[in-house]
A protein has these predicted regions:
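Short C-terminal boundary/hinge segments that cap the last helix of small helical domains
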Residues: 54-70
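Amphipathic alpha-helical segments of tetratricopeptide repeats
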Residues: 90-98, 130-138, 169-180, 209-220, ...
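Helix-turn-helix repeat elements of alpha-solenoid scaffolds
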Residues: 78-92, 118-132, 157-171, 199-210, ...
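Tandem amphipathic alpha-helical repeat scaffolds
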Residues: 69-80, 108-120, 146-161, 183-199, ...
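Short alpha-helical DNA-recognition segment
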Residues: 14-33
Length: 411
């Protein structure tokens, strides 16, 4: 512990000058060295200085040990993703920030505050916290430097600054031996997530498997589920259907047992994607219906699931009139061109193949390309390629097929 910093904290709190505090005990220059942690004073000197301020030094040591234990619990709750407990400890620690600033606990506390803000999705405070940490970096220990590399990487990814995240990851790999073992699983997970975002599903699978293995050995069961979900999504994108199917079933069961509602919902959605890829549209439809019932109407996520339900219903020849009516109500309220295009698309499905294909070719496909809706554009390109090939128009079929594959997943 930094005795001098704590001594200075209490001196300032008691509104004492250095001369007033050290009179008859030691020289002002010696007190200055103590307060700047340049020298370790004798026990007698420490006791006399604290007694002058009415503080029992032994009790102060016990107080320090208590706060050290709380900071360590804050760290462990963060590592093991116990967000409720982390928030409880954060509230307690935040009432003693002035004291913590005077101790050698401050770096670790401030580092994990950034991770706490990321978990809370409080990006303004997270951004502010990164600025604070930059100013503190010169005082970081090697361990704290290793921790900071991973937490900064998380910040870049949460901020969707993926280019900077990739650059940071390259720098991290140059100092791999300096990443604490406790953070290796997190580093593997973040790297897998970043590679997945870049559609490099093969490499992402490799690091997701490493994250799963690390979290399993570390008994980090909540983070294990997160890594398993990412792994199952990668398996889906690589058409490893049996591995993905088994993993999704495990994730859904464990997420439900553990009361992890958000993760359960994410697993439901991604399992439905797998089922649609396998042609099991009825199963996918049932999963999406279950998910939709869990969501708050009016949210962006609810809207996205409604659209996926419509796509699934159309693929599985499932009645979708009520879903179209619901999308119509949302479209009228929002007056969003994207939703208007989708609404017309689903309505044309119920009229004729020719009218649907004309609308897709003349309106929907150009609109989705222009506004960057690549997933929707690829879906329509695939349908148009099949349509033109069925009527012998191979030239157009090849054009749409080329777009579909060029914009496809880099597996």
């Amino acid at each position: 512990m930094n005795i001098g910093s704590i001594l200075k904290y209490y001196r300032m709190r008691n509104d004492l000058t250095q001369a007033e505090l050290c009179k008859g005990i030691c020289s002002i220059s010696h007190l200055s060295k103590i307060e700047s942690n340049k020298t370790i004073p004798r026990t007698e000197t420490i006791n006399e200085l604290f007694q002058r301020m009415g503080i029992d030094w032994e009790r102060e040591v016990a107080t320090y040990d208590d706060w050290k234990e709380k900071v360590e619990s804050f760290v462990m709750h963060s590592v093991y993703y116990d967000l409720k407990s982390m928030e409880e400890v954060y509230i307690e620690l935040s009432t003693q920030e002035d004291y913590l600033q005077s101790t050698d606990l401050v770096n670790r506390y401030e580092l994990y505050k950034l991770r706490y803000y990321l978990f809370k999705r409080d990006m303004p405070r997270a951004t502010q916290q990164t600025s604070i940490l930059r100013r503190m970096e010169s005082s970081f220990t090697d361990y704290e430097k290793g921790v900071s590399k991973v937490i900064y990487l998380m910040y870049d990814i949460f901020s969707q600054n993926f280019t900077e995240a990739e650059n940071r990851l390259q720098r991290i790999e140059q100092y791999r031996e300096r990443i604490p073992m406790l953070f290796e699983g997190e580093l593997f997970y973040q790297k897998a997530y970043l590679l997945h975002n870049r559609a490099q599903y093969g490499r992402s699978t490799y690091f997701a498997e490493m994250a799963v293995d690390h979290f399993l050995k570390d008994c980090n069961y909540i983070r294990l589920l997160h890594a398993q979900l990412l792994l199952a999504i990668n398996y889906t994108n690589r058409d490893f259907t049996m591995q993905a199917d088994n993993l999704f079933k495990t994730i859904l069961r464990n997420a439900k047992i553990m009361g992890m509602d958000e993760l359960y919902q994410g697993a439901l959605y991604n399992y439905s994607v797998l089922q649609n890829r396998r042609g099991l549209h009825k199963s996918a439809y049932e999963m999406l219906c279950e998910l939709k019932a869990l969501l708050e109407p009016g949210t962006d996520y609810y809207q996205a699931i409604l659209i996926h339900l419509l796509h699934t219903a159309s693929e599985g020849n499932i009645e979708m009139d009520s879903l179209i009516e619901e999308l119509d109500a949302i479209t009228k309220r929002k007056e969003d061109p994207y939703l208007m295009t989708l609404l017309t698309y689903f309505r044309k499905m119920k009229i004729s193949q020719q009218e649907l294909s004309d609308f897709c070719e003349q309106t929907a496909f150009p609109f989705f390309i222009k506004h960057g809706y690549i997933g929707e554009a690829r879906s329509i390109a695939w349908k148009l390629a099949n349509y033109h090939r069925s009527i012998g128009n191979d030239g157009k079929a090849d054009t749409y097929s080329l777009y579909y594959y060029e914009k496809g997943d880099d597996q």
